[in-house]
Amino acid sequence: MNIMRTAMLLAFMTALFMGVGYLVGGGSGMVIALLMASGLNFFSYWNSDKIVLRMYGAREVDRHSSPVYYKIVSDLAKKASLPQPKVYVIDNAQPNAFATGRNPQNAAVAASTGLLERLSAEEVAGVMAHELAHIEHRDTLTMTLTATIAGAISMLGNFAFFMGGQRSSSEDSHGAGAIGGFIALLVAPFAAMLVQMAISRTREYAADRRGAEICGNPLWLASALRKIADGGHGVYNEEAEHNPATAHLFIINPLSGEGADSLFSTHPATANRIAALYRQAEEMKGALAESGGWNEEGGMNKKSNDEMNYGDFRGGQAYVPGEQENSTFQRVTKRPSWLRYDNSKKSRS
């Protein structure tokens, strides 16, 4: 399904380029546009993930620089039977995250410092499980290509206007090129919106559900979405505002003023996603009650900050945060075994 969706997306982009090329340059313009589209599609397939990561200044981290964050991603990938993705941190106060890559073997996940600072380890696990679900569903290729292609489409108006102006100077065109350029200038933004809408919003619901299955508790992701939504739109994300074509990559729309569910939204309404996760938690209520994640009132158990300590990450050892993890991860007790460091035996010997 995603292979067909990707093929349709690339075909649409090629047709769009050729149509604009023909509009402003006739047959020769269409040929030039075809060559340009083919080159862009080829380049985007191999490099769009690198472009997006570089666009947001993402820096790769490992088990030494960010041991807790890296371990969460690593353990979740094992639980989902996925290859270990590359792990990145984005220096941005807005809590958010995304996944990218052309396939599971060449995938990466990125979380902002704002997300790591605001969320508990359980909530971070819920977010990362959601992103790994996108990788498992192979959404990441389509999502990343869409971001690159939609950005390119936004440039078509200027390209068409310039080419139209050149063509209008010929006697045969009699000003038709300028008119064609103006039409293309109007059509290009709408076409960019259509490309973004080519990625169905239902993929977010599917990734939420599968992510909850991977991490084992829908309430972790529900709590994370609420925190991200509450804190996200109040923090200006300069990179996202300058590159709105990438908004659909994130777990929650990073653009200011977004959040309501509508026909042209890149994401479902956060409240609807949380409601779906609570319904999923009801389905899993028995298993969650045994793990201590669900109380008798049908909500997530809360723990006081006084009970929280990093020792739970390492079987009782005092945990020293990595360079990228100072002041991150609210401390939470009673973590499942996979969410802890498992070298406690060594520490007691």
From Swiss-Prot:
Residue numbers annotated as active site: 131
Pfam short name (any one): Peptidase_M48
Cell compartments where the protein resides: Cell inner membrane
Record's keyword terms, sorted: Cell inner membrane, Cell membrane, Hydrolase, Membrane, Metal-binding, Metalloprotease, Protease, Transmembrane, Transmembrane helix, Zinc
GO cellular component, one term: plasma membrane
Region of interest: Disordered: 288-349
Enzyme's top EC category: hydrolase
Major location (coarse): membrane
GO molecular function per UniProt: metalloendopeptidase activity; zinc ion binding
UniProt xrefs under InterPro entries: HtpX_protease (IPR050083), Pept_M48_protease_HtpX (IPR022919), Peptidase_M48 (IPR001915)
Gene3D superfamilies: Metalloproteases ('zincins'), catalytic domain (3.30.2010.10)
Family as reported in the entry's similarity comment: Belongs to the peptidase M48B family.
HAMAP family: Pept_M48_protease_HtpX
Protein name: Protease HtpX homolog
Species name: Bartonella tribocorum (strain CIP 105476 / IBS 506)
